[in-house]
Amino acid sequence: MSAVITSMIVIGAGSYGTALAITLARNGNKVLLWGHDPVHVQAMKVARCNHAFLPNVIFPSTLYLETSLPVALTASRNVLIVVPSNVFGSVLTRIKPHLRPDARIVWATKGLEMNTGRLLQDVARDILGGHIPLAVISGPTFARELAAGLPTAIAIAATDVTFSADLQQLLHCSKSLLVECNIDFIGVQLGGALKNIIAIGAGISDGLGFGANARAALITRGLAEISRLGKAMGATPSTFMGMAGLGDLVLTCTDNQSRNRRFGILIGQGIEVQTAQKNIGLVVEGYTNTKDVLKLASRYRVVMPITEQLYQILYHNKNVYDAALTLLGRYYKDKQISYL
């Protein structure tokens, strides 16, 4: 059995995967959406809506749904992965036997491989081999606003310029979605992963009641940390001033649609880490990434004081006020340093 031939298969029927599928379909593309829970997918088929994550957003007629993964993967050579980073590798392993010979893989997952801190491009190459074109979508995007058709801008980077151009054509919409192509594959991935950590810090600052001034300072210092690590890992520093860097960082640090920010707010208000995670109810990418990024910082000999203090708070129960004083004391001592 074969699925309807489409321009894109979207793997992951959560809020963001569904929003991207809706956006692609609104652009006149045939799109197939697959989710791991067949009951959820069947409910969407009947309702023509993802009531669990995006209620009241009706699916375009060119958005199709499929419960069988092998059948779904016959629909297109273009496969968009939109799953949490902690299951990214297992999802690739699952889809590998069913991919078409001409398959191309793009992901909108933001994060690093859990426990190793590896970039998702390295995970993908290890599992799929080096012959499959790879791409990443990142940038300041909340699923609800994207699904509602509100103006949004994203960045795309790919290992193949043809793939990048094809993705831009599929996604770009003059009315609502601006798509920027970037050749910095490493930087676009890092920006999407590291901003979650800084967003937790911004949330803690706001939970403590430190105000807008402190939040702005933390975002600025956080961007400097991201840029330093990115440069050490081979990224282009200017990438972090674009959509995949500053754009995503500002969005995630300042709006309560961000679960990483909400998680930080709870901790700043005195809620224990594990309780805060349960209250959020969804994967908090920045929590696991904090430990992994600190390992990367050590490996590349990059100073990341905000990440270090967040690690102490999240994994060693350091008092949040003491962590803030540590940062303030450091910046006073380093006041002659011109580079943030």
Swiss-Prot record:
It catalyses: sn-glycerol 3-phosphate + NAD(+) = dihydroxyacetone phosphate + NADH + H(+); sn-glycerol 3-phosphate + NADP(+) = dihydroxyacetone phosphate + NADPH + H(+). SUPFAM superfamilies: 6-phosphogluconate dehydrogenase C-terminal domain-like (SSF48179), NAD(P)-binding Rossmann-fold domains (SSF51735). GO terms for cellular component: cytosol. Sn-glycerol 3-phosphate binds at residues 110, 139, 141, 195, 248, 258-260. It is found in: Cytoplasm. PANTHER family: GLYCEROL-3-PHOSPHATE DEHYDROGENASE, GLYCEROL-3-PHOSPHATE DEHYDROGENASE [NAD(+)] 2, CHLOROPLASTIC. The keyword Oxidoreductase applies. It is an enzyme of class 1 (oxidoreductase). This is Glycerol-3-phosphate dehydrogenase [NAD(P)+]. Its EC number is 1.1.1.94. GO terms for biological process: carbohydrate metabolic process; glycerol-3-phosphate biosynthetic process; glycerol-3-phosphate catabolic process; glycerophospholipid biosynthetic process. Catalyzes the reduction of the glycolytic intermediate dihydroxyacetone phosphate (DHAP) to sn-glycerol 3-phosphate (G3P), the key precursor for phospholipid synthesis. It comes from the Bacteria. InterPro entries: 6-PGluconate_DH-like_C_sf, 6PGD_dom2, G3P_DH_NAD-dep, G3P_DH_NAD-dep_C, G3P_DH_NAD-dep_N, NAD(P)-bd_dom_sf. It comes from Baumannia cicadellinicola subsp. Homalodisca coagulata. HAMAP family: NAD_Glyc3P_dehydrog. It holds the Pfam family NAD_Gly3P_dh_N.
